[in-house]
């Protein structure tokens, strides 16, 4: 594979576009808030006013426990017939990559003088990360969560409440992540002066996709240093799961201009042909959702369809603008795996390595198992293990017909 075009630090353009994707499709009432956010991000992140970056990286080091290890999975490597490394985001504080972005944005909110932070959450991981970041930085925290997800993720709801957040269940629509985002946007429109909207993935109107990518880039930066130290060369393949896309763009970004194959693994649910899936890149159309032009799951009338996945974090009917763009460019390969394949991979990693992966990350693992057939024993594959699976044990037990 040869990279004919540079992608790193080239996008988005001044209008927040990645090719045709992205932009700012928001009501007039939110435009001042978006402009204020853009200006603040430029001041504090890009121009590093008040040593913002140093403060952020110190929090990542001392509070999150970064860098997370790059772990050589010896028994999994033997099983698959190639060298397999796991980027252990499951070992970050709170058990997922979500805290990287939550801390970055909460710190930005504080510098902007906002007192109140709102967020949406699906699996609950972003909600927990936001609640923790707000507790750490002394900010009021409100979390919107689809009523179905509240039911699926009771443990995370209680974790958020323990950290002082108020969790508001959303009963409209499909009662999942999409509806939680809608509700959070309504709140922001009403309380724009005092409130910061902390978006959980590389989605939404500009500058969010760029901001989230920048805060998650640390994954790929560490990964590049670590693999060079361990192997003396870059990996052949990096595999990451994709819901909205933040862990994937975080892992991929540093490698966009390198000769490394990048696989974005979506939720195939009960199979693409059934319509019960969350695979917008593999089976979606271009549309507008939550403030940006992206690949979405929609029906023949252009209406957004409900997504489905056994994993709450992949249960979203769209994918961020940068990944949408990179798919069209042929720079990433979009693939999907079913619930059943993810469950198999979940059990495989538990059995071979004693590591309990999140169901989201199990999708990346499941595709890695398939991909290994095409790799040689000296080929290096890195799987971004985006989170740990404690939150999913009940879901897995139920799917396997076990009472706990």
Curated annotation (Swiss-Prot):
Pfam families named in the record: PALP (PF00291)
Record bears the keyword Cell wall biogenesis/degradation: no
Enzyme superclass (EC): lyase
GO annotations of cellular component type: cytoplasm
PROSITE patterns the record matches: TRP_SYNTHASE_BETA
Keyword Hydrolase: no
In-chain residues carrying the UniProt-annotated modification N6-(pyridoxal phosphate)lysine: 98
Upper classification of the organism: Archaea, Methanobacteriati, Methanobacteriota, Methanomada group, Methanococci
Catalytically driven reaction(s): (1S,2R)-1-C-(indol-3-yl)glycerol 3-phosphate + L-serine = D-glyceraldehyde 3-phosphate + L-tryptophan + H2O
Protein name in UniProt: Tryptophan synthase beta chain
Pathway connected to this protein: Amino-acid biosynthesis; L-tryptophan biosynthesis; L-tryptophan from chorismate: step 5/5
UniProt family annotation: Belongs to the TrpB family.
GO molecular function: tryptophan synthase activity
The protein's Enzyme Commission number: 4.2.1.20
GO biological-process terms attached to the record: L-tryptophan biosynthetic process
């Amino acid at each position: 594979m040869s990279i004919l075009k540079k992608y790193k630090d080239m996008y988005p353009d001044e209008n927040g576009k990645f090719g045709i994707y992205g932009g700012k499709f928001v009501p007039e009432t939110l435009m001042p808030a978006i402009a204020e956010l853009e200006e603040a991000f430029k001041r504090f992140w890009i121009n590093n006013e008040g040593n913002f970056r140093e403060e952020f990286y110190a929090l990542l080091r001392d509070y999150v426990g970064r860098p997370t290890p790059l772990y050589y999975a010896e028994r999994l490597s033997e099983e698959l017939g190639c060298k397999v490394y796991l980027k252990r985001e499951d070992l970050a504080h709170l058990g997922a990559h979500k805290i990287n972005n939550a801390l970055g944005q909460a710190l930005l909110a504080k510098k902007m003088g906002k007192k109140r932070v709102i967020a949406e959450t699906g699996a609950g991981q972003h909600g927990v990360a936001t609640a923790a970041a707000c507790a750490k930085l002394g900010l009021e925290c409100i979390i919107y969560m689809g009523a179905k997800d509240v039911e699926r993720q009771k443990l995370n709801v209680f974790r958020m409440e323990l950290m002082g957040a108020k969790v508001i269940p959303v009963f409209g629509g499909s009662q999942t992540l999409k509806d939680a985002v809608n509700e959070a946007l309504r709140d922001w429109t009403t309380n724009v002066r005092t409130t910061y909207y902390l978006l959980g993935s590389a989605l939404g109107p500009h500058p969010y996709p760029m901001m989230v990518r920048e805060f998650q880039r640390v994954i790929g930066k560490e990964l590049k240093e670590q693999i060079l130290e361990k192997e003396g060369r870059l990996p052949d393949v990096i595999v990451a799961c994709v819901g909205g896309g933040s862990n994937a763009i975080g892992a991929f970004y540093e490698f966009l201009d390198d000769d490394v194959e990048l696989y974005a693994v979506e939720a195939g649910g009960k199979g693409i042909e059934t319509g019960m899936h969350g695979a917008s890149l593999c089976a979606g159309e271009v549309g507008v959702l939550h403030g940006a032009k992206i690949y979405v799951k929609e029906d023949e009338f252009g209406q957004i369809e409900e997504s489905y996945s056994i994993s709450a974090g992949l249960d979203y009917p769209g994918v961020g603008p940068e990944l949408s763009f990179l798919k069209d460019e042929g720079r990433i390969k979009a693939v999907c795996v079913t619930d059943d394949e993810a469950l198999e991979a979940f059990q495989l990693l538990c059995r071979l390595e004693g590591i309990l992966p999140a169901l989201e990350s199990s999708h990346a693992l499941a595709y890695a198992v398939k991909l290994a057939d095409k790799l040689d024993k000296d080929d290096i594959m890195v799987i971004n293990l985006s989170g740990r699976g404690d939150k999913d044990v009940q879901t897995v037990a139920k799917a396997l017909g076990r009472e706990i």
